[in-house]
Amino acid sequence: MLTATLTGDGETYMASLKSGLEETPNSPLLNWFSSGGDYNNYKKFSTDFPEHASAAYNMVAYGYANGEIGGKVDYEAAMKALDKSRELHDGPNALDSRAEIYAMSGDYLKARQNQFGAYDYASFASPYQPKLVTYWRKENKDEIVKNLKEAQVNLQNAILERNEEEYLKYVTEDMQLVAGDSNLQEFYEFTNESLNRQNDVNWNSFDLRDINVDFSPDMTMAILTFYADGSYTQGDSEDVVDYSTRASAVWIATDNGWKSVHANWAPYGGGSGIPKN
């Protein structure tokens, strides 16, 4: 059976498991191996082998949380199952599961508290650390949204004013900002040289509005969508061009805060973008 497991020989593995159960039907280990794939099987295992059921209770908790056991979501039953899991083995995995199930229920404060408990077992190179950060960000999502909206406005103002010191607060050396301008020319890497390049656009006004923020599930990336209105003249001309665009931007979470890595602009609502180079 071990050889079949190591070599990935599924047919031999299942035959060995069947033979083993026929010879030793009360083996907790062999019954555990045969329980996979169905939450109700894990529940049966926890009843048949209660002294060896820490891992089974952990899986049963997910069965309740997903509504796979009992036909409806039952977070209270899930937590009771995890309590039983911890009574048999007081390790980090059950705390990690409690955190994940609290997150499923939308309680990110309790999720983070339990994730801290799991993290305390092994803080060095801990596999529990990333979710700890995720739960903190979910718990503080409103504040992060507010800060990202402000950052997008500040970044755009820094670009318009060619304020390199301010601009550098919102980008990272680890990943170049890639932009697509509203003149619909090719995408390009927006560098310090791009920031300081002179052009003949004279802005009368430029305002962002209706900024919306969405996050990736792990809260490491944010997608901002928004609109921009304003007007400008070009060169010595006094003709005013009405500027109207829709845009999106990608921000990533780094060790130094949220940084912009992509922006895409396009004319919107009958207005114009910036002139072609």
Task: Please give the residue ranges for each predicted region.
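Short, low-complexity N-terminal intrinsically disordered segments enriched in polar/charged residues
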Residues: 133-173, 177, 274-277
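A solvent-exposed, acidic/Ser-Thr-rich amphipathic alpha-helical stretch
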Residues: 164-217, 227, 241-243
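Short beta-strand edge/turn micro-motifs at domain boundaries
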Residues: 244-274
